[in-house]
């Protein structure tokens, strides 16, 4: 396994770990932290996907923009997944930096469920890029 492949695997592992963390945080009613971990699960998985395509970015906004440009706008990723990643990007910022922000438990549960589907869908794209 070369260095790039090791980094891709690392990001994929981190994505799953963050989603597992989000579930634990939800059980402990730590909704802000759960939202943060959901976002990072998506971010790490998208970072792995972009690196598999030979792209790397230092800023979260760069990762988001490249994902939308390279995968959502081209139809390689369902637009709903793109919208979900965009929403979680905003929720994470609001939750981390906003004042008097509260998240509803049912919303966080739904976001975890959607994040599982997101990670699975991106996983398939990463595997396709590895085979290409």
UniProtKB/Swiss-Prot annotation:
It comes from the Bacteria. Gene3D superfamilies: Nucleotidyltransferases domain 2. Belongs to the UPF0332 family. This is UPF0332 protein TM_1000. It comes from Thermotoga maritima (strain ATCC 43589 / DSM 3109 / JCM 10099 / NBRC 100826 / MSB8). The lineage of its organism: Bacteria, Thermotogati, Thermotogota, Thermotogae, Thermotogales.
